[in-house]
């Protein structure tokens, strides 16, 4: 949830670290800080708020250092204050650490250190790392062995960086079930939670695997070990992103830019995985066999869970294989039945979602037939830990509320359904080609939808509302769930979603005169049922905003306002309706004057429980 950055090289370290932290703010922005080694001591500066606050506090400082670490925080242990901000130092200010993750046994370690006479200055779990390392280092005088020993005492998921005032040429770092990437430049090196933070300097990286530490020296010298200090050889690879991918490119917000990038992202995946006849290409999950499993278990969090929920409807209708969808944070503690012939599908934009990675461990423990990952980051823990991985290829997504990554997930899951139908021969060639034709048309339909002025202006009439009800059925229900989540995330509106058929079982009691109800009517199989539900809430004087296909103009007779979506193949329509929900949330947040890219209390990558 936090962002770590470190630099060692010939440049002045502080400006490099500040720039790197600015690229990591999507991971947390409660507070920020940095520490640098200057002659015979550490320089430490911390502020509450965003990286710009930290930068402003350093404008008049001259920090002659070539080694520094920095941190931008999303609070888990301890409220956002200067004392709880990172970096944390030991009681003698000899070493400084930055940390992302949670130390599960910090209370025991803290009590042990206090019994040794060591004083703590913060409420965080992270300070334990600095104090424990200093305690060991004082006894042994060995920097690397003390670091290794400290790591062996920690329980939990974490990544960290450490510097010491007496070692101005060494940057230590480690990862345990939390991402940390090393960047290798010309006589300089970087560490970061995300490689995007140092792309302006280098595209050569090494990703630390769980249970690995690195000793980074001047001149791009990197030695990698496991926590027991057994040397590990790691290959250097090149990342494909460019620093320009992180720019807004003329848009007011990253979220808006990423909404408008969706047609291109979808078109790229469609042309990669469909042949000219509209059939699924052999390159899609090449070597994948359906004979190994008889059920599917999908596990994810947040928006990715909604994508998995839609996949359940699609796959079960195309292939007649039972599909179970679980929230990862519940799955890991539920003691669910998991058969040996299960295909496990784990979905995570970042590939670092803590609960989803815990589910991966559980599936491995249960020895399921196959584990498939769907994510956007090739060097992520999810991508490297599964049997097969489908990459979103959505490019960098910086807006905290997922847009293009989510629709790419939907597309890959639709393609997965078609792949399974091909392998099981449950779809005729004509039906398959009709689906393919619908997919080929999708990017242009997205562009048409994005040009709909009625959609962009809807918030003008509803920006004073503080509660919405979303209703959908079948394929539209998971998409309504996602639309409601988007309104919560960035417009801070209480938006509740229900299957339309459940209204009479309780939620209809919430309806009073003028209650805004948004209905997604795009599934033709249940269109008449949706009309019936609209009439039910209208009878209770609700104000109904109907989102429907262009061919469903009769919806105007039973609703108060309408947003029309281009006609499309039923399998494709959920993606178009998703974009409607994104624009609704964006325009509402814009009208209310909220910070769209960095909504309160949220972070892009949820790397802790």
Swiss-Prot record:
Q: An example of a Gene Ontology BP annotation on this entry?
A: UDP-N-acetylglucosamine metabolic process
Q: Which Pfam family, an example, fits this chain?
A: GATase_6
Annotated membrane-spanning segments are none
> Which GO terms fall under molecular function for this chain's record?
carbohydrate derivative binding; glutamine-fructose-6-phosphate transaminase (isomerizing) activity
Give the keywords, sorted: Aminotransferase, Cytoplasm, Glutamine amidotransferase, Repeat, Transferase
Quote the catalytic residue positions: 2, 604
Name where it's found: Cytoplasm
Q: Which GO terms describe its cellular component?
A: cytosol
Q: Which reaction does it catalyse?
A: D-fructose 6-phosphate + L-glutamine = D-glucosamine 6-phosphate + L-glutamate
Major site of localization recorded for this protein:
cytoplasm
Task: Look up the domain of life of the source.
Answer: Bacteria
Q: Where is the SIS domain?
A: 280-426, 458-599
Residue ranges occupied by any Glutamine amidotransferase type-2 domain in the UniProt entry: 2-219
**Signal peptide region:** none
Q: Does the UniProt entry include the keyword Manganese?
A: no
What are the disulfide bonds? none
Q: What is its EC number?
A: 2.6.1.16
Q: How does it assemble?
A: Homodimer.
Q: What does this protein do?
A: Catalyzes the first step in hexosamine metabolism, converting fructose-6P into glucosamine-6P using glutamine as a nitrogen source.
The name of this protein is Glutamine--fructose-6-phosphate aminotransferase [isomerizing]
Q: Which organism is it from?
A: Chlamydia caviae (strain ATCC VR-813 / DSM 19441 / 03DC25 / GPIC)
Q: What gene is it encoded by? A: glmS
């Amino acid at each position: 949830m936090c962002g770590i950055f470190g630099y060692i090289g010939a440049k002045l370290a502080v400006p490099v670290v500040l720039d790197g932290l600015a690229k990591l703010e999507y991971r947390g922005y409660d507070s920020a800080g940095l520490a640098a080694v200057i002659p015979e001591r550490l320089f430490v500066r911390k502020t509450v708020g965003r990286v710009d606050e930290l930068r402003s506090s350093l404008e008049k400082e001259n920090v002659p250092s070539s080694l520094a670490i920095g941190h931008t925080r999303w609070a888990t242990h301890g409220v956002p204050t200067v004392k709880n901000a990172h970096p944390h130092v030991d009681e003698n200010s000899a070493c400084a650490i930055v940390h992302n993750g949670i130390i599960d046994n910090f209370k025991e370690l803290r009590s042990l250190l206090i019994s040794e006479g060591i004083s703590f200055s913060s409420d965080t779990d992270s300070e334990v790392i600095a104090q424990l390392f200093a305690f060991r280092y004082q006894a042994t005088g060995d920097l690397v062995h003390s670091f290794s020993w400290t790591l062996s005492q920690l329980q939990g998921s974490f990544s960290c960086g450490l510097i010491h005032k007496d070692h101005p040429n060494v940057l230590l770092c480690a990862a345990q079930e939390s991402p940390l990437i090393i960047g290798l430049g010309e006589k300089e090196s970087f560490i970061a939670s995300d490689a995007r933070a140092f792309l302006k300097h280098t595209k050569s990286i090494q990703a630390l695997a769980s249970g690995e530490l690195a000793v980074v020296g001047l001149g791009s010298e990197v030695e990698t070990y496991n926590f027991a200090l057994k040397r590990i050889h790691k290959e250097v690879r090149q990342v494909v992103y460019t620093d320009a991918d992180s720019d807004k490119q003329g848009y007011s917000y990253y979220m808006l830019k990423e909404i408008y990038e969706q047609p291109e992202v979808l078109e790229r995946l469609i042309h990669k995985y469909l042949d000219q006849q509209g059939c699924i290409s052999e390159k899609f999950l090449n070597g994948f066999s359906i004979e190994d499993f008889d059920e599917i278990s999908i596990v994810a969090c947040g928006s990715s869970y909604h994508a998995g929920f839609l996949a359940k409807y699609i796959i079960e209708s195309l292939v007649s294989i039972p599909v179970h969808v679980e929230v990862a944070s519940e799955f890991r503690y539920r003691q669910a039945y998991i058969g040996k012939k299960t295909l496990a599908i784990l979905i995570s934009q970042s590939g670092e979602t803590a609960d989803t990675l815990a589910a991966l461990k559980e599936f491995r423990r249960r020895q399921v037939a196959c584990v498939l990952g769907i994510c956007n980051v090739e060097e992520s823990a999810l991508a490297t830990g599964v049997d097969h991985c489908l990459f979103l290829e959505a490019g960098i997504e910086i807006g905290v509320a997922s847009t293009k990554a989510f629709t790419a997930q939907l597309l890959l899951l639709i393609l997965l359904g078609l792949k399974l139908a091909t392998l099981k021969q449950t779809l005729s060639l004509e039906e398959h080609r009709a689906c393919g034709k619908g997919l080929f048309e999708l990017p242009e339909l997205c562009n048409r939808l994005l040009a709909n002025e009625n959609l962009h202006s809807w918030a003008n009439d509803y920006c004073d509302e503080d509660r919405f009800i979303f209703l959908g059925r079948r394929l539209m229900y998971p998409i309504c769930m996602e639309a409601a989540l988007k309104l919560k995330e960035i417009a801070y509106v209480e938006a509740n979603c229900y299957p339309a058929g459940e209204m009479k079982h309780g939620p209809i009691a919430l309806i009073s005169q003028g209650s805004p109800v948004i209905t997604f009517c795009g599934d033709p199989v249940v269109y008449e049922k949706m009309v019936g539900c609209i009439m039910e809430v209208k009878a209770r004087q609700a104000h109904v905003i109907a989102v429907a296909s262009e061919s469903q103009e009769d919806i105007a007779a039973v609703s108060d306002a309408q947003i029309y979506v281009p006609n499309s193949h039923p399998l494709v329509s959920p993606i178009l309706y998703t974009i409607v929900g994104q624009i609704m949330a964006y325009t509402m947040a814009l009208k209310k004057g909220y910070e769209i890219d960095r909504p309160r209390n949220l972070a892009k990558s949820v790397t802790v429980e």
